[in-house]
């Protein structure tokens, strides 16, 4: 799940880095990612040790916070703390966002702010109505290489897919079904309210 979060956020964050490098076609995406809340619907295939795992879900993110729902889990992060909810087993895990190099794994939204310092982004290659970006890491972040495809067929550029080679040898391919923007949500949206869970739930707090 962390690999899916990391790669999906890198996919979104590329618009910020590319626009900063002077890519005018992504300026509108950059502005939206910087000033609004982004809602993303995705499907993905994770290949690890020859085994393929299919998944799909939704991601809502702004600043250093996110909520991700998919593959039977709900994950909330307000930039400081992390709540992982497994509804089927009625378990909740609470932890602090890590510091240092591990911070990118416990709160991948940090990749958005540090994208230019973490990745080298090659010049985009345009094929038909699509633009492909290649990236390679400058430091450890869980990804060894990746590509992102953006469609410019319509009036506004949109993300369509991403393919990422993970540091542990896994391969993650993501298809973006939709990506929309809205006004920023209150920070409480990214915090799990524990008052709604009764004694039948197992809550583990590692903070």
Predicted ranges, named:
Residues 1-8:
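Bacterial N-terminal signal peptides that target proteins for export
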Residues 97-130:
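Flexible, surface-exposed loop/linker segments and immediately adjacent secondary-structure boundaries
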Residues 31, 56-61, 74-75, 120-126:
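Short, exposed beta-strand/loop patches in secreted or surface proteins that constitute
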Residues 42-46, 67-71, 132-140, 161-165:
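Short beta-strand segments that buttress and anchor functional surface loops
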Residues 5, 16-52, 64-65, 196-207:
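N-terminal leader/targeting segments and the immediate start of mature chains
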Residues 52-56, 70-71, 78-79, 143-148, ...:
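Short, surface-exposed coil-to-beta transition loops
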Residues 127-131, 139-145, 154-207:
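Non-transmembrane domains of secretory- and envelope-associated proteins
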Residues 58-105, 169-172:
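An acidic-aromatic
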């Amino acid at each position: 799940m962390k690999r899916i979060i990391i790669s999906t956020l890198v996919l979104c964050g590329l618009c910020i880095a590319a626009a900063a490098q002077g890519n005018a076609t992504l300026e509108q995406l950059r502005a939206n990612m910087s000033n609004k809340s982004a809602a993303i619907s995705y499907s993905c295939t994770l290949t690890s040790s020859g085994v393929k795992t299919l998944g799909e879900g939704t991601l809502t993110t702004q600043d250093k916070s996110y909520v991700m729902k998919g593959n039977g889990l709900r994950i909330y992060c307000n930039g400081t703390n992390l709540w992982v909810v497994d509804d089927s087993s009625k378990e909740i895990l609470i932890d602090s966002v890590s510091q240092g190099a591990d911070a990118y794994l416990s709160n991948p939204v940090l990749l958005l702010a540090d994208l230019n310092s973490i990745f080298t982004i090659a010049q985009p290659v345009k094929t038909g109505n699509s633009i492909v970006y290649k990236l390679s890491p400058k430091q450890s972040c869980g990804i060894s290489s990746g590509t992102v495809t953006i469609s410019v067929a319509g009036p506004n550029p949109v993300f369509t897919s991403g393919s990422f080679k993970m540091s542990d040898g896994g391969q993650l391919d993501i298809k973006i079904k939709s990506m929309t923007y809205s006004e920023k949500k209150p920070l409480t949206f990214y915090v799990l309210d524990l008052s709604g869970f009764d004694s039948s739930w197992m809550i583990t707090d590692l903070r």
